[in-house]
């Protein structure tokens, strides 16, 4: 449907950002299962995205592929690293198509844009075309990472966020921010309100890999780490009421 434009409101005073990148892991789509996709979970996340889209915010999305195949894990088990990474990229395309179906069932038009050419299921990545989709209020789901092995989907999300002129990256996780120690193991763990890129790197806080953090720092892209399991968590940050950690310069 080349002329489809999702009706919506212009991003106004109720949204802190007009264009954002949402990065979620592939594992977030598998619910309580140990592998693959859990359709009710995919639908729940799609509704979270729809809620933000209804605010008039332009949304870019990158989903990992770890619920299906993880390149590093395959490499550790003896596979050739480049081949394993390409297999991981294909897994992200599968997740992107699943999310596209869930979003469009809710009336949110999307485009899956792949860094690896596969014309039958996704558009090739062309920056100006992708920006035009965003301006038409279509959610752009960027798949297949950067199209190159040895780069994570965190790095791909930061790269696309920079290219798309996003104002912030939202990293959806299982916890509501960055902690000084694992909150699942330590009851006295303290959540940071803000943390710098350099502190993330020096303290190995695990927000994103070093390449992604360095690229975000270079382009002055704030990273919001929040809980994807918290209902309304994504939208609450945009309306100024959410709980999260902000990674800044």
From Swiss-Prot:
Homohexamer. This is Uridylate kinase. GO terms for cellular component: cytoplasm. Residues 31-36 are annotated as: Involved in allosteric activation by GTP. It is found in: Cytoplasm. The keyword Glycosyltransferase does not apply. It comes from the Bacteria. The gene is pyrH. Keywords: Allosteric enzyme, ATP-binding, Cytoplasm, Kinase, Nucleotide-binding, Pyrimidine biosynthesis, Transferase. It comes from Jannaschia sp. (strain CCS1). It catalyses: UMP + ATP = UDP + ADP.
């Amino acid at each position: 449907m080349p002329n489809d434009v999702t009706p919506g409101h212009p991003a106004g005073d109720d949204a802190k950002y007009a264009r954002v990148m949402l990065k979620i892991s592939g594992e977030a789509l598998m619910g309580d299962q140990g592998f693959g996709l859990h359709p009710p979970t995919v639908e729940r996340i799609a509704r979270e995205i729809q809620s933000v889209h209804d605010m008039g915010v332009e949304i870019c999305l990158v989903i990992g592929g770890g619920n299906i195949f993880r390149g590093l894990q395959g490499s550790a088990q003896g596979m050739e690293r480049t081949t394993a990474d390409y297999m991981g990229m294909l897994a992200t395309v599968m997740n992107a198509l699943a999310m596209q179906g869930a979003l469009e069932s809710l009336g949110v038009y999307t485009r899956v844009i792949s860094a690896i050419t596969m014309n039958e299921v996704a558009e090739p990545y062309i920056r100006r075309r992708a920006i035009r989709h965003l301006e038409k209020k279509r959610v752009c789901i960027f798949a297949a990472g950067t199209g190159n092995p040895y780069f994570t989907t965190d790095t791909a999300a930061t790269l696309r966020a920079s290219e798309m002129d996003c104002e912030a990256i939202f990293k959806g996780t299982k916890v509501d921010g960055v902690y000084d120690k694992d909150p699942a193991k330590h009851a006295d763990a303290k959540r940071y309100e803000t943390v710098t890129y350099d502190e993330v790197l020096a303290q190995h806080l695990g927000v994103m890999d070093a390449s992604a953090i360095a690229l975000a720092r270079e382009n002055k892209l704030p990273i919001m780490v929040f809980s994807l399991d918290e209902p309304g968590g994504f939208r609450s940050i945009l309306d100024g009421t959410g709980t999260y950690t902000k990674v800044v310069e």
